[in-house]
Structures are given as structure tokens and as C-alpha cells.
């Protein structure tokens, strides 16, 4: 959903668009709630309130003030991520395909021959980080840039087994044009760029679990963040390999040597970060042309000092000369060294060239060892070739993708590697490594152990759900870790599957009820975005690869109506009820009937079940941005702080009724996941509320009326407004509550319209207009520790006779209250009050 705020209506009609005019009779929160439950994707919000826009954005719903037709057209035709704190719109708009254009935010790609393999007549455009270079295209009242690129296609091609780039590109563009937008993946970079600066500013020690190549630039500015990944491929792992020969397989039609070098250096930087937690100087030997340095400098400020007889245009200091052993003393501490020296073959005989390459490999290693043998805080990444060679058993081997699989690979060495045991590795084993292993991640840090880290802030985005982790260990970590942002795969299956497949692995699935948390928020991706200054125009698909975002130790926990709130809670219900259901009242009718309340007169006004909890359960796949457990818990302890809106405090029994309705709904729909979720939420309600039932009551509250429009043969026809189980010394507490509620009780608009047999030999009249007051009374008694109400549904009625009678229907008739009293069952009246 996107909300576009306009001062004036527009003449043009847009598909999937609805207009909402600000209702001045309601406050900003109520307007935000009403907007969020509209069913179209685009909302044109007229006569808007800035406060309402802010509320929507904090809820994760993109809401933007629009001041021109161009702005409206740009925003209504695509999806976007909105940085509402800095008023920046990041479009995810691929309409540039109509210019016969693909886009990249990586400069090095523009220096390759990729143009020869594009679709006929197409071009490649460099748009900068997150499309920053496109800002000049939009002369808007807000900062706007198009973050959409085709880098995902290019990178997927590089790692694929396909060689024909044009066919690959064509297929992927057609897929993009015929499938829903993977909005979470597209906006994730924007999210990470907001998330980590805010966390690092607050927390001294931050752990990040499971980063992938998509984050390779994000963390360059954060050397103190400790990364955990899948570990490195080290020399001693080669013992499992059988010897092979030179393969000579082409991987990419266009030259990706630049990409390989960038990945090698970035891998080395992050390896250095995990050892020394600071930024190094980067030395490079055999550097030309290294156009990718430009890419790194767009993200983070590094000093690159390079040696090569050819130009390296983007290095900080360039020595246009060869590097020799005698120059090693020029390399200072707190640095990384990238050695990429190899003579081009040219027209040289391959045997002669092979000898030169092997000698250069030995020389490269000697430079690496000498560099590491003196000084401190150093890491080296060195180019090697497949040959009989001794290497430290702990050396880290790299084989990032390059244009052709030939004989080259790389090793990362640190100061400890050079003093460890070396192992002789035959040439054939190195060929086996080169032919079969591709380094898929620039993060080669060790795996994360699922243990609490009390002084650290843990971030684990899409990293822990894999089934090679113990499910219970994941739960324990989340329950015990005081400060963290951790995601787990949500169970949005219909058969309550404990795990689901993802690519070539399996993920555990989770529901919010799997966790025992306090001071934590459990929400969706868009709900989490709202907590970090972002909002989004499109929620993830309800049955997609979605995750729960669990934020432990947040200062936003008690801001119940601002973050992870109830906005959008009824949206799916509205979509169903106003389109395909038997009546728009279907939800109200079902909730009452499933709790054996058959008086459906005014059911949409006077419903006996919490619609919030019911919708949050049966449509949780759509609205799990709403943190239901937090909402229940804060109500249970009486710490619901709200800024505005039409606030109604539910009685705990209303929540129980909602769970019962949701369970029956789940059974009818054969939705085993909702069935379990509703059962567990009901248990949670009973856990956090101290609910007691007057199933064996000794007192009741009665209401006597001036007159009853039916014949009766009971002594005093009355409405029982609830039964109690109390000791005699608690009578005073009950009377005190009744006196406090006196005005509200006598203001009830009570009416009746028919009679019926409640049970065999019990003939009663229906009563409408008391439920909302009954639940308020229930809450007051609950807060005063008075046992009020039974476990079965409260169905207001007036007993007329204890014999069988025929049903009578009359026009709805108001009943005027004569008195309200407290009476002991089979005893005397102990309190009576009149208006």
C-alpha cells in the first residue's frame, strides 16, 4: 500500500486506486487506521494531515506528500522504499527498459566488453550507489532516485553455469516483467544502510551473522562490527580432493577479471577487520587498471597505494613502476597487501610462459612472507598458480569467479600463518580446487555459535533458520539475548509444516508464540522498517519466503500505537468481506455464531468477540506487522500508552472468545497453522491474565425495568448483567465498582425485539445494547480482583417463564432501567441503586 497525499483531487483515474478525504471529526490516529484498512494499492489522500502521514510511515506504510502531477505519476506507477526521516524516495522502477537500457551501480562493469552481449540496440548505464546518479532526473519536492538496477541479473549470470549472456539477460528480464516484485530484497540495501549506523551509534559491540555478497559494500564503513559467516576454505581442507588436470573452462562471455580482483580485496579487508577492528591502508602490486577502486570509494574512504607500470586511475597514490623485494620496507603496519603480479602470455610459448608464471608465484609468496614477517596488523592476499607448492595449512584459499577457469587462485595469509606448519600440495590437488570450488562470499569469517552474548548487539538477518541449526537453540538465543535484531522464517504454511524448502536447503518455521519474550517486538519486514525510519509501498506476499523480525531491547516497545501497531489489521478482512463473501457482515456473524451467540441483531455494532485478535489470528499471514503478543501483554499489565485514536480496552474474555472463533475458522478452512496459533495465543492470554470464572456463582447483578413488552409468569423479570463468585467481605468492592459505573450503566440503550427458548423450559427475551458496557464492567472487576462472569459466552437475556412458549417478535422496543442491584443467589438483595 502507498499513500499519496494531495491538496486537490486529480481528474485522471488510476487503476487500483482509491480516494480518502481526511475526516476532521476523527483524530490523526483514527484517520491513519482507516486509511491503512482500505483495500486498493494506491490511496490518494486529500486534505491530508502531516501527523497522519507520520503515523503511517512509522507503521511501515509509505505515505508521501505529493506536490505536482509529475511527482504523482512517478510514485503511482512503481513501488518504492521511503526514508521518511530524510525525505528520500528510492524508486524500484524498471521502466527504463523502454529506453533499451540496462543499469548497474558498479562502475567496473562499464569498463568491460559487456556491451557486445546486450540485447540488440541496448545500452548499459552506470547509475551509482542505490541509483544516486539518477537524482538529477527528478526535480521533485522530495529527494528521489531510482535504485532499480540489473546487477542482480549480472551477478547471477556470473555465478551460473550459463555462458550465453544475451539469452540469460532476456530470460531474466521476461521473468521480471511477469512476476511480482521481490520488494524486500530490493529495499534491503536501503534498510541495511539505515540499520547499521543507528545500531553502531548506540552499541559499542555489534555482531553481524550471515552477511552475503549483497552486503559487501555496506560494512566497509564498520570495521568494528564482528562478522560471522560460513568460514574459510583453508589449505588443510584440500586433503579431501583428488588430483585433476587443467580445465580451461570459460565462465563469462565478458571480462570479469575486475570483479574477481575487487572480491579478493574486499574479502581481505573483511578478514583484516575481524582481526584488528580498524581500517587498513591497501597496498596493491600489479594493480592496473583496477577501475573497481572507484566503486569501493563510492561507499567508503580508503587509501589505495599501488604499483604497476600501467596507469591505475583511481588509486590514492600510484607508482608507475614495478615492485621489487627491496621495496617491501615501504609497506607500513596496519595494512593489507594485494599481490596480483603475473606476466601476460602474449605470443610466448606456453611452456616458457609456464616457467615464468611458476617463478613469479614463488616470488609472490616470498614478498608475502617478508611483508608479514615484520611489523604488526598485516594481512596479505597473494596470487598463486596451480603447481607443486608448500603452503601453511591454515592459509585461506580463494577462488572467486573470473572470466575463465584456468590455473590461478589466491591465498590470504596473516602473521600467524607464516609461523604455522606448511604442507606440500601437488599441482593436481590445486587444479581440483580450482575446477570444483568457487568462493561465493567475501565474508569468510567462522560460523556463529548459537550462544547468548550479553554485552553485544546481535544482528542476524535471514541467517539462522537453516535446519543445520538446532531449532531449540535458535529459540533459546532469541529468548535470552537482551539486545538483538534476529529474523526467522515465519510459518505461513497451511499444514503447520515445521520446516520448508528454500533453494537447496530447508528452513525451520516459527510463529510468534514459539518465543518467550519481554521488552521485545515481533513484527514483519515492513513493521521493522518503520522502526528504523523507513516505510515501503508493497508488503511481501503472504505465502512467500517471509520472516519474523524480532527486535530485543528496543526503546519502542511501549509505543504500542506507533510501531508494529494495528494499522492494516482489518485490510484482508475488508478485501474478502466486500468482494467474495456472502455478506459484508460475514466476519461479525461468524464470530458470534461460533461462540453460540445467536442474537445477530446489530452484530456489526455490538459484537461479542475482539475483532482485532480474530483478524490478527486468521489473517496473520497478511497482518503480522501487528505484534499481537505485545499488544496482549501490555493490556494485561495495564501499560497501554496511546497517543490518540479511538481506544477501546478489550476485556480478557473478549480475547478468549476471539481465539475460539479463530479455531473454528481454522477447522473449516483446514488451516492447521492458524489452529495451532489460535490455541497457543489462547494459552498465552490465560498465562498473562489471571482469569477466574464464576461458574459456580453466589451473587449476581440484576437490572429491573419499568416495564416489559411481553407476557411473563416469573415473579420479577430482570436482566442478569453478570454473575460473581465472591466472599461476603468483597461485597463492598463490588458496590464501589457499580457506583463508579452508575452513570454509564444507566445510559445504556437497551432494547428487545423477540423471545425464544434459551433451553428446555427456559423462555427468555433477547436484550441488545449491553455488551460493550458489560465488557467495561468486566475489566473494572478484573482490575479489582473480583471474579465476574462465566467461562461460557455471556448472552444477555430476560427470563420470562420456566415453561415452553411460542416465539414472539415485536418492533424493537427500548427498555427503561428502573434499578440496578446486587443480590445473593437464593438470598437477599445487598445493594440497589436507581437513576
From Swiss-Prot:
Instruction: Name the EC number(s).
Output: 3.1.4.-, 2.7.7.50, 2.1.1.56
Ranges where the record places region 2'-O-methyltransferase activity: 246-428
Keyword Transport carried by entry: no
The GO biological-process annotations, alphabetized, read as: symbiont-mediated suppression of host innate immune response; viral process
- The segments labelled GTase/RTPase activity in the record are 556-692
Ranges for region N7-methyltransferase activity:
171-245, 429-555
Swiss-Prot/TrEMBL catalytic activity = a 5'-end diphospho-ribonucleoside in mRNA + GTP + H(+) = a 5'-end (5'-triphosphoguanosine)-ribonucleoside in mRNA + diphosphate; a 5'-end (5'-triphosphoguanosine)-ribonucleoside in mRNA + S-adenosyl-L-methionine = a 5'-end (N(7)-methyl 5'-triphosphoguanosine)-ribonucleoside in mRNA + S-adenosyl-L-homocysteine; 5'-triphosphoadenylyl-(2'->5')-adenylyl-(2'->5')-adenosine + 2 H2O = 2 AMP + ATP + 2 H(+)
GO MF terms here are: GTP binding; hydrolase activity; mRNA 5'-cap (guanine-N7-)-methyltransferase activity; mRNA guanylyltransferase activity; RNA binding
Annotated active site residues, numbered on this chain, are 718, 720, 797, 799
Report the locations given in the UniProt record. Virion
Q: Can you quote a single GO CC term?
A: viral nucleocapsid
Location (main, coarse): virion
Q: Which domain of life is it from?
A: Viruses
Region (2'-5'-phosphodiesterase activity): which ranges? 693-835
Q: Which UniProt keywords apply?
A: GTP-binding, Host-virus interaction, Hydrolase, Inhibition of host innate immune response by virus, Methyltransferase, mRNA capping, mRNA processing, Multifunctional enzyme, Nucleotide-binding, Nucleotidyltransferase, RNA-binding, S-adenosyl-L-methionine, Transferase, Viral immunoevasion, Virion
Name the HAMAP family for this protein: Rota_VP3, Rota_VP3_A
What does its UniProt record remark on the domains? Contains a bipartite N7-methyltransferase domain, a 2'-O-methyltransferase domain and a GTase/RTPase domain. The C-terminus contains a phosphodiesterase domain that degrades the 5'-triphosphorylated, 2'-5' linked adenylate oligomers produced by the host cell in response to IFN stimulation.
| Function recorded in the entry | Multifunctional enzyme involved in mRNA capping. Catalyzes the formation of the 5' cap structure on the viral plus-strand transcripts. Specifically binds to GTP and displays guanylyltransferase and methyltransferase activities. Has affinity for ssRNA but not for dsRNA. Capping activity is non-specific and caps RNAs that initiate with either a G or an A residue. Together with VP1 polymerase, forms a VP1-VP3 complex positioned near the channels situated at each of the five-fold vertices of the core.
Write out the similarity annotation. Belongs to the rotavirus VP3 family.
Q: How does it assemble?
A: Interacts with VP1. Interacts with VP2.
Give the protein name, as stated in the record.
Protein VP3
Name the source organism: Rotavirus A (strain RVA/Human/Japan/YO/1977/G3P1A[8])
